[in-house]
């Protein structure tokens, strides 16, 4: 890594999200944490500053967003009064569905970073809102890790709300850290699949993918959770069937979507799974940035039984098959990394615009940030976390996000595209959520 990097060219993965935001295909992520103390500015500002000085990407922004190659460049300072806001009478669900609709972080104001924090829920919940161009889902928990450290340290009196950014160098983008160049086979396959020629899609019948995206993106998000007791049951089930938590959530989500949209009959469902790429990169595991791969799993001719007594058998079959295939993909990430490399062969803005003329690429998307533990004996604790991508996904109409706190609940958010009928969208979200929780409870009992 360069000894000191004030600015660099944006990578293609970063540019993909930049162009989405320019085209009002909003690409923001939120990760919130509920703390055990009141987050007044006197205690919060020093804690946020602690995160800023330890994570150089928090001091960066995108310049020249309309050019072919935007620049990631450090600011000199950040005014905390401009990035820390209080709405302590609001809850995260109403905040997400109201304040964050059509919300995007401004590329035109060159004094601001591409993130903000809002304090909600009687000053106990801190919502970190950030642009996907510079940060992935895994960056959210890292931010709260440093804020928690800052809250546990001796307090610093601020004479001014304006603070300097980190002196650490900007981390390199994903494409500089791993080989993403697609093979000839990968290139030919991509060209053939998108050629529009007869049989170019193969012999597989179409999958359910919902309607085409509509700009500006809009969605409805609901939050829900399962208790630590249920989490323990799922952990035991995971051991018994040798499948990961993500695999279990995947299978239950697929069943829930099927019962919500298909009623009966066979259907093809495609699931996109976000994969934290830090495990494959020679960078510190604690580095904030946009380091994410995607893996797509195809479920062909899916027609589960309508009988509740068959739920567990179907779920186990789905979870074990998916877990096996995902483990194989993770053992050799070359296929996933090549998908990032393909972005160098397309006009991203043109690709995004054309995506609004056809159905989305997949049925659903799931992102599980994982299991997070914090010091149990500290004076300040994180009691709960939530994670959402509250704007409609370009890739799928249904998006499930998961995050778990040690000795606490496992929290979910479900975002569903909103095509203008918000009431109907809300009803569909409730239907999928209720089915998800019902199946999850049944399959985890007596595990």
UniProtKB/Swiss-Prot annotation:
GO terms for molecular function: alcohol O-acetyltransferase activity; N-acetyltransferase activity; phosphatidylserine transfer activity. It is a multi-pass membrane protein. The keyword Transmembrane helix applies. Its main location: membrane. One of its GO terms (cellular component) is cell division site. One of its GO terms (biological process) is intermembrane phospholipid transfer. The keyword Hydrolase does not apply. The chain crosses the membrane at residues 28-48, 241-261, 397-417. Keywords: Membrane, Transmembrane, Transmembrane helix. It holds the Pfam family AATase. It is found in: Membrane. PANTHER family: ALCOHOL O-ACETYLTRANSFERASE 1-RELATED. This is Uncharacterized protein C18B11.03c. It comes from Schizosaccharomyces pombe (strain 972 / ATCC 24843) (Fission yeast).
């Amino acid at each position: 890594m360069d000894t000191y990097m004030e600015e660099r060219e944006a990578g293609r993965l970063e540019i993909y999200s930049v162009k989405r935001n320019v085209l009002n295909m909003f690409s923001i992520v939120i990760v919130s944490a509920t703390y055990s103390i009141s987050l007044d500015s006197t205690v919060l500002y020093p804690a946020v500053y602690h995160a800023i000085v330890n994570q150089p990407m928090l001091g960066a922004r995108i310049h020249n967003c309309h050019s072919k190659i935007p620049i990631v460049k450090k600011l000199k300072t950040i005014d905390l009064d401009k990035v820390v806001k209080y709405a302590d009478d609001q809850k995260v669900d109403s905040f997400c569905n109201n304040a964050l609709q059509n919300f995007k972080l401004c590329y035109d104001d060159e004094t601001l970073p591409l993130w903000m924090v809002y304090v909600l829920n009687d000053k106990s919940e801190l919502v970190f809102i950030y642009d996907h161009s510079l940060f992935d889902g895994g960056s959210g928990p890292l931010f709260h890790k440093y804020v928690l450290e800052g809250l546990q340290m001796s307090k610093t009196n601020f004479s001014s709300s304006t603070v300097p950014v980190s002196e650490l160098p900007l981390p390199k983008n994903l494409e500089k850290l791993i080989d993403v160049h697609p093979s000839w086979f990968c290139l030919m396959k991509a060209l053939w699949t998108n050629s529009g020629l007869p049989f170019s899609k193969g012999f597989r019948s179409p999958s359910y993918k919902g309607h085409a995206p509509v700009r500006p993106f809009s969605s409805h998000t609901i939050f829900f959770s399962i208790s630590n007791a249920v989490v323990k049951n799922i952990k035991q089930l995971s051991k018994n069937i040798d499948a990961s938590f993500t695999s279990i959530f995947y299978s239950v989500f697929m069943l829930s979507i099927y019962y919500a949209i298909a009623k009966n009959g066979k259907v093809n469902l495609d699931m996109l799974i976000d994969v934290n790429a830090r495990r494959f990169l020679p960078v510190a595991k604690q580095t904030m940035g946009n380091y994410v791969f995607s893996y797509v799993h195809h479920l062909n001719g899916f027609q589960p039984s309508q009988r509740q007594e068959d739920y567990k058998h179907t779920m186990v079959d789905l979870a074990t098959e998916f877990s096996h295939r995902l483990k194989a993909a993770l053992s050799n990430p070359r296929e996933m990394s090549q998908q990032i490399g393909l972005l160098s062969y397309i006009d991203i803005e043109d690709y995004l615009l054309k995506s609004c003329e056809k159905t989305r690429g997949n049925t659903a998307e799931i992102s599980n940030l994982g299991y997070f533990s914090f010091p149990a004996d500290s004076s300040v604790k994180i009691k709960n976390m939530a994670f959402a991508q509250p704007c409609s996904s370009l890739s799928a109409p249904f998006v499930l996000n998961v995050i778990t706190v040690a000795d606490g609940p496992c929290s979910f958010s479900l975002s569903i595209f909103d095509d203008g009928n918000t009431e109907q969208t809300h009803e569909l979200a409730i239907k999928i959520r209720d089915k998800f929780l019902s199946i999850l409870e049944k399959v985890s009992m007596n595990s």
